Regions:
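Generic recognition of long tandem-repeat/solenoid scaffolds
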Residues: 42-51, 99-103
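Long, charged/polar, surface-exposed segments that mediate recognition or autoinhibition
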Residues: 74-85, 141-145
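Signature of long, low-cysteine stretches enriched in small and polar/charged residues
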Residues: 81-119
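Surface-exposed amphipathic alpha-helical segments
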Residues: 128-157
Length: 157
């Protein structure tokens, strides 16, 4: 699982750090996230939660690109096309708020992607990659998706 998460992490981008002024970096760090990568057009924050014998990883990506209705679909497609070997795309569906993707690894690790379809801040698209051992059903995923997108958007000023 660590290799898969590392590849996802690298695929989302890593460089030096300088966040836009509409992102609250102190709040991000206060909530246990680390800056995982920063490019001119993307900021990635990362958090690992260890509970008993399990580990969960949360990656929140902020893409700074001109608004375009095709961006969420392209980001979802990017996740599908760049998923690491050993991580199988299971299915996806859309809600009013997001495109949700589900991936499964052989050892019962599940990776969920949540790509927001609407921007809270102009030209800033939020997406989340969540790795866990929990196999959520479709009816549960919308609630999980909203929780993580709400969290990601809470760091926007």
């Amino acid at each position: 699982m660590k290799k898969i998460l590392l590849v996802l992490f690298l695929a989302l981008g890593i460089i030096s750090f300088s966040a836009p002024n509409f992102i609250n970096i102190s709040k991000i760090e206060k909530n246990g996230y680390e800056i995982g990568g920063d490019k001119e057009n993307r900021l990635l924050i990362v958090k690992t939660l260890e509970k008993e014998n399990t580990m969960e990883n949360i990656y929140i990506s902020y893409d700074f690109i001109e608004e375009n209705p095709n961006v969420p679909n392209r980001k979802h497609q990017f996740f599908k096309e760049t998923s690491p070997e050993g991580l199988e795309f299971t299915n996806s569906f859309e809600t009013k708020r997001a495109i949700i993707g589900k991936y499964t690894e052989i050892n019962n690790t599940y990776v969920y992607t949540f790509v927001s379809k609407k921007n809270k801040v102009k030209n800033c698209y939020v997406s989340v990659c969540y790795a866990t051992d929990k196999n959520f059903q479709k009816n549960e995923l919308e609630k999980v998706c909203n929780k993580f997108l709400d969290e990601g958007e809470s760091y926007l000023k």
